[in-house]
Structures are given as C-alpha cells and as structure tokens.
C-alpha cells in the first residue's frame, strides 16, 4: 500500500531533508499553503491539499486541512476492516505521516502586537491534525518537533519502519505540546479577567537539563515561561559554566533585591538569603559596602548589581571566590578582568523582574499567590520620638530587604547598608538577636512582622538601635511602643506584613 505524508509547517528548518528522504522511499507528499510552495520551489514532488479534498483554501487560509478526506485518512485504524471498507467506499487514501508545527503563538503573544493580531496566530488546523495523528499513533507517525526528524529517518533506514515505542513517544510529545499551547492561549484570553481561574494552566518549555537539583541525588531541569520574558528566562551567560539549580534560585532572589532600588544597589546572597545589601553612588562602592557587611558569608556566594559593572568593581570582585556575578551590563575591560576567573559565572540580566503570580508545589497540589511587591503607602510614627530623615530612608531600605529574608526576619541597617540580617528563626527574639549580633553599630531595625512582645525592643535598645520599623498589628503593640518611649527609640508602623515561608 502506498504511503503518504502530510506536511504543513510554519518553521521549515529541516523539512526539505525530511521530504526528500520520504520521496526517495516513494512516499507521496501532500501539503498546503506556504509549505506546498516552499517544497515545490525546492523541486520536491508534492500534491496540494486541494487536489485531495477537491475544495479550495478559504477564509484567508483559516480553512485548509479541516476536511473529512484528510482526517479520515489520518484516523482510520488500519486493522479495522470496517474503517478500511469505509475508506475504500469513499475513495479516501490513508495518511501515514503527519509533519506539522504550529503558528508561533508562544513568540507572538510576547510581542508588541494588537489583540487581534495575536489572535490570528492561534493555530486551528495544525493542532487538529496533530491530535488526530497522535490518537492513531499505532498507524501514523506524527512529528511536531523538528528535533525528531532525524530519529524517524534513522529508524526507517535501519528497520524500514518506525517502532511502536518511538511512535508512542512522538504522540505523547504532541499532547505535551498541545497542553502548553492551549495553556498559553487560555492565559492570554483570560488575562485581566480571572486572577485565579477554575483550572490552572501554565506553559513552560524546557531550556536545559541540569546536572542535579539542590543535591547530587536529585534530578532537575530548568523550564522557561512561554508567555512572558522575565529576568530568569532572558539572561545571557558571558563567562563560566551553565548555571546550576541552586545558582538559578539564588540569582533570582539576588537580582530581585538589587532591582528593588532606584539608586545603585548591590545584593550579596548565599543559600537564597541576602547576606549583604547596600546602596550608593557607583558599583564599586555598593559592592564593597555589601562585602564589608558580611565578608565571611559572601565567599562562594552570588552578587547582583543593578548598574553596569566597571573595571574597578571587577578588580575587587576577583579578589575572592564568587559563584555568580550579575548585572544589566559590563564594561569590556571589566569582562576581561572577570574572565580571568574561568569558573566565575558572569551573567548579563536583560530584564527587570516581572510581578507575576508566585507558585509553590505541595504534596498533591499547587499554592498560588501574588508576588509580595507592595510597600507601605504611609509610614505611621507611633512613638514620642520621630525618626530623622536618614533613619526613615534606612527604614524603607530595611523593609525592601527584609521581605526577601525567610521569616522570622529582622534586618539591621546603617547608612544604606544592611549590616545585620537574621532570618529563618522560629521566634522573633532569636531573629532579632542574630541580626543584632551581626549588625553591631546599626541604627535602624526592620521587622517583617509585628513584635508579639516588647523583648525585641529591649534587645534592640541594648545594642544601640535608634529607630524601628515594623508592620504593627499585635495585641501587645502598646507594650512595644511603651518600650520604645522608655529607650528613646522612634518606631514606625507600615500596616504591611512581609512573611516569607
């Protein structure tokens, strides 16, 4: 029985080689639209789909392959006598290969196009053919990914057929693709309508397999959103090896912290926790301030700066071992210096972080919430003493940092530098003591949540703290206010909590 292949592709890379391979094996090629024209121009013998259906393309190409003569040829089960009898009676030929890739909706939805223009890139005929072929994978070879062309050709060369195992895998890839494609369309159409829809569909594409996850015994891979360009799916590696699982997680937080500030800022980070954060006039100044805040923890850590890195900064950075250095850009002479460290990963972050929903898996489900991107609308002074202008600036700085520290979280600040960070403690007094121990000489203390008792204020006073900022909201707020008044400390309530679990 003569074999037939239906080829209809938007991305034509590799399709000429595949079509020629099939024609050399006497497989009849059927195509439509631009693919038909492309194959014809490249001397591939091909039939136009309208010759099969006796029906022209219509509605500006919206209807080309949506026809019973096409889909019956794909869906007919070859060892089902009734199916084959129906095909014979209707003079319908079987289709044995379906080679289709889709309109680039993933790419176009991210471009600056009108709503109507984006809608035109929603493919209908392609998914219909792919789904039909994938359902009937026992009899039809379905190719939705150009990376699989060679696998199919190799099996045909070796065995004169495509194995059941590969057919099944290719069919699975179709439905995997279609779920992502449909998710992207769904999210596009529901954007701004339902913040938390009835069914959660997310669309991510694998960028790379990672060597391992958090630990060597854990497998891992990195997936990129198909729907928007965030900071972590658009960076460029300018030096060093590929990023690890831990590198990517840490870089994400370090870059978010640095981008919290309009002024030049640096975040040094280790194990997903900031260990030194500073603002200042230039990249060298903020790096050295962040380094001095905790010269021990920064070793082997990640550093992100929200400004171009110059040679002077790079020369300071290479004095110690760092895993990753990230910035929006680098001077050429700075890159030369950084590249003297062969294993130092130098990352150009092209985008600022996008405020999207945050998801975390639990056993049997996913929790979804909005990003914690809100700061206080007003700062309410609740004590007799008011903070100075510099103390208020440090308070706001501290609240920008503390929301990235695991709760219970305390940050001690002095002159635009987080001098002490205490986090991940099961009670607030321990976090306070940890931050104060590291941040001796700090003037301002920021807390991610209210003080349940006055003990944190008393501890702060013993260590020279002059001003405190916290959300407020405890039933014992008055005790903390009274303690501040006793110690001559100013305190501000924000009304905005920043728990991080």
Swiss-Prot record:
Alphabetized GO MF terms: IMP cyclohydrolase activity; phosphoribosylaminoimidazolecarboxamide formyltransferase activity
Matches recorded under Pfam families: AICARFT_IMPCHas, MGS
Keywords: Hydrolase, Multifunctional enzyme, Purine biosynthesis, Transferase
PROSITE patterns reported for this sequence: MGS
CDD domains associated with the record: IMPCH
Domain of life: Bacteria
Every MGS-like domain range: 1-144
Catalytic activity: (6R)-10-formyltetrahydrofolate + 5-amino-1-(5-phospho-beta-D-ribosyl)imidazole-4-carboxamide = 5-formamido-1-(5-phospho-D-ribosyl)imidazole-4-carboxamide + (6S)-5,6,7,8-tetrahydrofolate; IMP + H2O = 5-formamido-1-(5-phospho-D-ribosyl)imidazole-4-carboxamide
Pathway participation: Purine metabolism; IMP biosynthesis via de novo pathway; 5-formamido-1-(5-phospho-D-ribosyl)imidazole-4-carboxamide from 5-amino-1-(5-phospho-D-ribosyl)imidazole-4-carboxamide (10-formyl THF route): step 1/1; Purine metabolism; IMP biosynthesis via de novo pathway; IMP from 5-formamido-1-(5-phospho-D-ribosyl)imidazole-4-carboxamide: step 1/1
GO CC field: cytosol
Xref: SUPFAM superfamilies: Cytidine deaminase-like, Methylglyoxal synthase-like
Entry EC no(s): 2.1.2.3, 3.5.4.10
GO biological process: 'de novo' IMP biosynthetic process
Protein family (similarity comment): Belongs to the PurH family.
Domain notes per entry: The IMP cyclohydrolase activity resides in the N-terminal region.
Matching HAMAP family: PurH
Protein name: Bifunctional purine biosynthesis protein PurH
Species of origin: Clostridium perfringens (strain 13 / Type A)
């Amino acid at each position: 029985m003569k074999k037939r292949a239906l080829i209809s592709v938007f991305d034509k890379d590799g399709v000429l080689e595949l079509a020629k391979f099939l024609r050399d094996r006497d497989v009849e090629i059927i195509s439509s639209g631009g693919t038909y024209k492309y194959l014809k121009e490249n001397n591939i013998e091909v039939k136009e789909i309208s010759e099969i259906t006796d029906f022209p393309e219509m509605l500006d190409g919206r209807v080309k392959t949506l026809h019973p003569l096409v889909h019956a040829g794909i869906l007919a089960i070859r060892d089902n006598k009734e199916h084959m009898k129906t095909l014979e009676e209707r003079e319908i030929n079987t289709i044995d290969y379906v080679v289709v890739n889709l309109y680039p909706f993933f790419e176009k939805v991210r471009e600056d196009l009108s709503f109507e223009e984006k809608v035109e890139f929603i493919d209908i005929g392609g998914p219909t053919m792919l789904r039909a072929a994938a359902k009937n994978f026992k009899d039809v070879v379905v190719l939705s990914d150009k990376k699989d062309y060679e696998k199919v050709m190799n099996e045909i060369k070796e065995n004169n057929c495509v194995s059941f195992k590969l057919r099944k895998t290719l069919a699975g890839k179709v439905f995997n693709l279609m779920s992502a494609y449909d998710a992207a369309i769904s999210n596009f159409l529901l954007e701004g309508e339902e913040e938390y829809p009835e069914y959660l569909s997310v669309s991510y594409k694998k960028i790379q397999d990672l060597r391992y996850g958090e630990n060597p015994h854990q497998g891992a891979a990195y997936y990129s959103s198909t729907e928007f360009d965030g900071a972590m799916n658009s960076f460029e590696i300018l030096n060093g090896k590929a990023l690890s699982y831990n590198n990517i997680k840490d870089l994400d937080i370090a870059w978010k912290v640095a981008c919290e500030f309009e002024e030049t800022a640096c975040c040094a980070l280790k194990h997903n926790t900031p260990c030194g954060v500073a603002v200042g006039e230039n990249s060298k100044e903020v790096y050295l301030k962040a380094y001095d805040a905790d010269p021990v923890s920064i070793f082997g850590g990640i550093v992100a700066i929200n400004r171009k890195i110059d040679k002077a900064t790079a020369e300071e950075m290479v004095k110690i071992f760092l895993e990753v250095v990230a910035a929006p850009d680098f001077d050429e002479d700075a890159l030369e210096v950084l590249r003297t460290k062969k294993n130092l990963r130098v990352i150009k972050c092209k985008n600022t972080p996008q405020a999207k929903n945050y998801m975390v898996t639990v056993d049997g489900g996913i929790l979804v919430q909005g990003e914690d991107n809100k700061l206080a609308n007003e700062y309410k002074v609740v004590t007799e003493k008011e903070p100075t202008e510099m103390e208020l600036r440090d308070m706001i700085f501290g609240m920008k940092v503390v929301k990235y520290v695991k709760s219970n979280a305390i940050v001690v600040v002095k002159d635009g530098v987080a001098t002490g960070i205490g986090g991940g403690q099961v009670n607030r007094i321990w976090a306070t003591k940890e931050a104060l121990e590291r941040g001796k000489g700090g003037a301002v203390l920021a807390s991610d949540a209210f003080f349940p008792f006055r003990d944190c204020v008393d501890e702060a006073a013993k260590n020279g703290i002059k001003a405190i900022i916290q959300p407020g909201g405890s039933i014992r707020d008055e005790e903390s206010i009274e303690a501040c008044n006793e110690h001559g400390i100013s305190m501000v309530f924000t009304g905005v909590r920043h728990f991080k679990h």
